[in-house]
A protein has these predicted regions:
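A polyanion-binding, active-site-adjacent surface
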Residues: 1-146
Length: 146
């Protein structure tokens, strides 16, 4: 779906993400800018090579510069590891705040992972409540130093 429409998160995982944004954070998805670290899908949906991520980095930086978000949410392993400049597993990064280019950033599981592991939905809901609290004015506890 994402490839044919050229828009991230429009398939089943995207529909789940929309419900979570609107029901937990309580803002319309239309007020959330969603982009991918990698700007195209690797062949056969394989994991991206570091060189592929490096090629896309300037585009991501420009997107973030233009949008100037209050908070960034890193969905999944590759986004979290890239934004936090670490190879720490997503299970250890999930639910933790850091800063990317001075912007408060939180890592959580990717919605596609939740489609395969529904038992993890509760922890992601907890992460989204942390995001809501920060958007409502709470100070995040920065735990990941990047």
């Amino acid at each position: 779906d994402e490839d044919s429409q050229g828009i991230p998160f429009v398939g089943r995982a995207g529909q789940m993400l929309t419900r979570m944004i609107e029901n937990v954070i309580e803002i319309p998805r239309s007020e959330v800018y969603i982009c991918n670290v990698l700007k195209c899908r690797p062949p056969k949906n394989r994991n991206p090579e570091p060189s592929e991520i490096d090629c896309c980095e300037p585009y991501l930086h420009k997107q973030i510069e233009i949008i100037n978000p209050r908070i960034i949410v890193a969905l999944g392993k590759f986004a979290a590891q890239f934004l936090f400049a670490t190879d720490t597993p997503i299970g250890k990064l999930r639910g933790k705040f850091g800063r990317y280019r001075g912007i408060t950033t939180l890592a959580t599981y990717h919605p596609a992972y939740l489609l395969r592991n529904s038992s993890q939905k509760r922890v992601v809901m907890d992460d989204l409540l942390k995001i809501k609290a920060v958007l409502d004015g709470a100070e995040p506890e920065i735990e990941v130093l990047c």
